[in-house]
Regions:
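C-terminal catalytic "cap/lid" subdomain
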Residues: 1-247
């Protein structure tokens, strides 16, 4: 630092530094070498049928990274997206072609789903009988934000009487007990009961091609139903569908 202090750049800091240097020198791409030969459609150590992805967009890689994919850190991908720096993810041990992380406009999508990610360290918290009025959700999440507790999926039920509703959200399992404690000590909100389920997992499918492909949501839900897997919560965006299930 300017004051001469020495500190660690943290996990993924070397990747982000490499991207920053590539941007400064305006190189054609930034090559990141790791212990795998690219980005896979899922964890190849757990899913034998996982396939290496030749090209993936910044947005898709950001989603997969945030959902637990460990090949690239979100900070490096975000820096590359802002600076429009193409990334080549390659193996240190082979000469095989890796994965290109590039602008979405330069990818010709032939498949709707690019990758599948999962995490086993989630918790689901539900507040029953919350007052149905403006500002309540903000009051619930304010102390969590101040205590650096990240909230992921949020689902609010439709109020049937216009007075009370239910609010469900997910956090990391390591934060759930602290979150419950903060909620119980929060005098700004009123609710009837609070439930915690800290034995849940999250499964997500990611793909920029989903927005133009009808039926992806149905296929995912049908696949889970055929395996008798019940969905506890659902969250969607243009390029991601996430569900919470029992562990």
């Amino acid at each position: 630092s300017k004051t001469g202090d020495i500190t660690s750049i943290g996990r993924g800091g070397s990747d982000a530094t490499a991207v920053a240097i590539a941007k400064i020198f305006q190189t054609d791409s930034c090559e990141i070498y790791t212990d795998v030969d690219g980005v896979y459609s899922s964890d190849p150590n757990k899913i034998p049928l996982a396939k290496k992805i030749d090209k993936i967009s910044y947005e898709e890689m950001l989603e997969l990274s945030s959902l637990g994919a460990k090949v690239m850190q979100s900070s490096a991908v975000q820096a590359a997206m802002i600076g429009d720096v193409p990334i080549q993810v390659k193996s240190t041990f082979t000469e095989r072609k890796g994965t290109e992380i590039i602008n979405q406009e330069n990818i010709d999508y032939t498949k709707a789903v690019t990758g599948v990610a999962y995490s086993k360290d989630d918790a689901k918290i539900t507040l029953l009988g919350v007052e149905d009025k403006p500002g309540v959700a903000a009051d619930v999440f304010e102390p969590l934000s101040k205590n650096q507790i990240n909230v992921d999926m949020v689902i609010q039920n439709i109020s049937t009487d216009g007075k009370k509703t239910d609010l469900t959200f997910t956090t990391k399992r390591q934060d759930c007990k602290n979150a419950i404690s903060l909620i119980k000590s929060n005098k700004k909100i009123k609710y009837e009961k609070v439930y915690l389920n800290d034995k849940v997992s999250k499964i997500s499918i990611v793909g920029a091609g989903m927005v133009a492909t009808p039926g992806i949501t149905y296929k995912m839900f049908r696949s889970l139903a055929e395996e008798n897997i019940n969905m506890l919560a659902i969250s969607t965006s243009e390029i991601k569908i996430s569900v919470i299930i029992d562990e």
